[in-house]
C-alpha cells in the first residue's frame, strides 16, 4: 500500500460513515452571533460562554499591549519571551485561584500533554475518567506509565483502582465540566479518595472556570476543594486562547525544568497576556454575566423538555441533544442553519458510536429571543 492509498481509504471510510470533518469559514460577531458567506447566524456552537471575545475592554487591552510590546513574544519564555505582562497574569491567576504559582501555556492541549510527559515514569499509573479529554488520553498513550480509565464520574470505581497496588506514583485526572455531555464531576468525592503522598489530583476545568463558583473561580471552588494541579483554559469563558496550570511552587519549578511543551514553544504574545488580565477583571466582577448565562440555560432547558430527543442532564452552558445516527445529526444541524441557528453536529470518534449529537452551547451574550428562536427551530426540525 502506498501513502496515498492509505490516506484515500481513510477518507473514503470517513465519508461513508458521515464522519468526515470539514472546516467552515466563519466571522465572529457581537451578540453571540457569527457571519458565514454574508449571512448572520445565531451561534450556538462556540465556547464564548460570557461573550468576552467581543468585549471592548479586552480589545482595548490587546491593542494597548500591542502598542507597548509588539504583536509577538519573539521567543520561548525560557529565552527572552517572558515579559512583565506574562508575570503579572500568572501572579493574578495564582492569587485568584489560591495557588502558589501559575504557568502559562499556548493551549490546554499542550498543558495536559506537558504534565503527563514531565511527571510520569514507567512504574507510575494514571487513573483517568473514561470521558477525559483527548489531550490527556493521547499523552497517556505515549507515556511509560500505565493508564487505567474508571467509569465516568464513578468515584467508587476510582476508589477500587486506587486500592490496587502500584509500584510507583499515581496521577488521578478528571474534568470539572465534561465538554461533550456538559455534566460535572463529583469533585468533592474524588478529592476525598485521591489523597496521600503518592497520589496527585489534577482537574481540567476548561469549561467551569469563569462561569461557576465565587468570582467565577470554577468547579473546584463550588466543590470546596483545591487539587494538586488545576488547568484553566482561556478559549472558553475568557474569550481568548491559551491556558494556565495552577500548582505549588516546587511543582512549578520542576515543570519549568522538564515540561518540553513549555520550554520549546514560543510564549504567547505579551499583548494577549494584557487582554487576559483584562478578561480576569471582567470575570471576577462578572456576577451579572453569570446570572444572565444561568437564566439562558434555564430558559432553554424548560423549552426543550418536550423535544423528541434526549436532552443531556446538564446544568451548564453545554446542552447536548442526543440524536443517534451521524446522518440524522447532520440533517438536523442543517435544518437549524436554514432557520438562522448555527449548530454543529458532533459525531464519533469524538463521542461514542450511536450517540451523535447537537452540542448546543449557550452564552451570556444570547438574548431571550435568541433562545426562543433556537427552540422554535428545534421543534420545526424534529417534525
UniProtKB/Swiss-Prot annotation:
Is the keyword Transferase in the record? yes
What the record says about family reads:
Belongs to the class-II pyridoxal-phosphate-dependent aminotransferase family. BioF subfamily.
Q: In which pathway does it act?
A: Cofactor biosynthesis; biotin biosynthesis
Kindly report, in one word, the top-level EC class recorded for this enzyme: transferase
Q: Which residues bind pyridoxal 5'-phosphate?
A: 108-109, 179, 207, 233
GO BP annotation list: biotin biosynthetic process
Pfam families registered for this protein in UniProt:
Aminotran_1_2
Q: What cofactors are annotated for this protein? A: pyridoxal 5'-phosphate
Single annotated GO MF: 8-amino-7-oxononanoate synthase activity
Question: Which residues get modified to N6-(pyridoxal phosphate)lysine?
Answer: 236
What is the official name of this protein in its record? 8-amino-7-oxononanoate synthase
**Which InterPro entries is this protein grouped with?**
Aminotrans_II_pyridoxalP_BS, Aminotransferase_I/II_large, AON_synthase_class-II, AONS_Archaea/Proteobacteria, AONS_Proteobacteria, PyrdxlP-dep_Trfase, PyrdxlP-dep_Trfase_major, PyrdxlP-dep_Trfase_small
Native source organism of the sequence: Cronobacter sakazakii (strain ATCC BAA-894)
Q: EC number(s) of the enzyme?
A: 2.3.1.47
Amino acid at each position: 500500500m502506498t501513502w496515498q492509498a492509505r490516506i484515500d481509504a481513510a477518507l473514503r471510510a470517513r465519508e461513508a460513515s458521515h464522519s468526515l470533518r470539514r472546516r467552515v469559514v466563519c466571522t465572529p460577531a457581537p451578540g453571540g452571533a457569527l457571519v458565514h458567506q454574508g449571512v448572520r447566524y445565531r451561534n450556538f456552537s462556540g465556547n464564548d460562554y460570557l461573550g468576552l471575545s467581543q468585549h471592548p475592554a479586552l480589545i482595548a487591552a490587546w491593542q494597548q499591549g500591542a502598542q507597548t510590546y509588539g504583536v509577538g513574544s519573539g521567543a520561548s519564555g525560557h529565552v527572552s519571551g517572558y515579559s512583565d505582562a506574562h508575570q503579572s497574569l500568572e501572579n493574578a491567576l495564582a492569587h485568584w485561584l489560591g495557588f502558589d504559582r501559575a504557568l502559562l501555556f499556548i493551549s490546554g492541549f499542550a498543558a495536559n500533554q506537558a504534565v503527563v510527559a514531565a511527571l510520569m515514569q514507567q512504574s507510575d499509573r494514571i487513573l483517568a475518567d473514561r470521558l477525559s479529554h483527548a489531550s490527556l488520553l493521547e499523552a497517556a498513550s505515549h507515556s511509560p506509565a500505565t493508564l487505567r480509565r474508571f467509569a465516568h464520574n464513578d468515584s467508587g470505581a476510582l476508589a477500587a483502582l486506587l486500592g490496587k497496588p502500584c509500584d510507583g506514583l499515581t496521577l488521578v485526572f478528571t474534568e470539572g465540566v465534561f465538554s461533550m455531555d456538559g455534566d460535572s464531576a463529583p469533585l468533592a468525592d474524588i478529592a476525598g479518595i485521591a489523597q496521600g503522598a503518592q497520589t496527585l489530583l489534577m482537574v481540567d476545568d476548561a469549561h467551569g472556570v469563569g462561569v461557576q463558583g465565587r468570582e467565577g473561580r470554577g468547579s473546584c471552588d463550588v466543590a470546596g476543594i483545591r487539587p494538586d494541579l488545576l488547568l484553566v483554559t482561556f478559549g472558553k469563558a475568557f474569550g481568548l486562547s491559551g491556558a494556565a496550570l495552577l500548582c505549588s511552587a516546587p511543582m512549578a519549578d520542576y515543570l519549568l525544568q522538564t515540561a518540553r511543551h513549555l520550554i520549546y514553544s514560543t510564549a504567547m504574545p505579551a499583548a494577549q497576556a494584557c487582554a487576559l488580565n483584562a478578561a480576569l477583571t471582567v470575570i471576577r466582577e462578572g456576577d451579572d454575566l453569570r446570572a444572565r448565562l444561568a437564566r439562558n440555560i434555564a430558559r432553554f432547558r424548560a423549552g426543550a423538555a418536550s423535544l423528541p430527543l434526549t436532552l443531556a442532564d446538564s446544568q451548564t452552558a453545554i446542552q447536548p441533544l442526543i440524536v443517534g445516527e451521524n446522518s440524522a445529526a447532520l440533517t438536523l444541524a442543517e435544518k437549524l442553519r436554514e432557520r438562522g441557528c448555527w449548530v454543529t453536529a458532533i459525531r464519533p470518534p469524538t463521542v461514542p458510536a450511536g450517540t451523535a449529537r447537537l452540542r448546543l452551547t449557550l452564552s451570556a451574550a444570547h438574548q431571550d429571543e435568541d433562545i426562543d428562536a433556537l427552540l422554535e427551530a428545534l421543534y420545526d426540525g424534529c417534525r
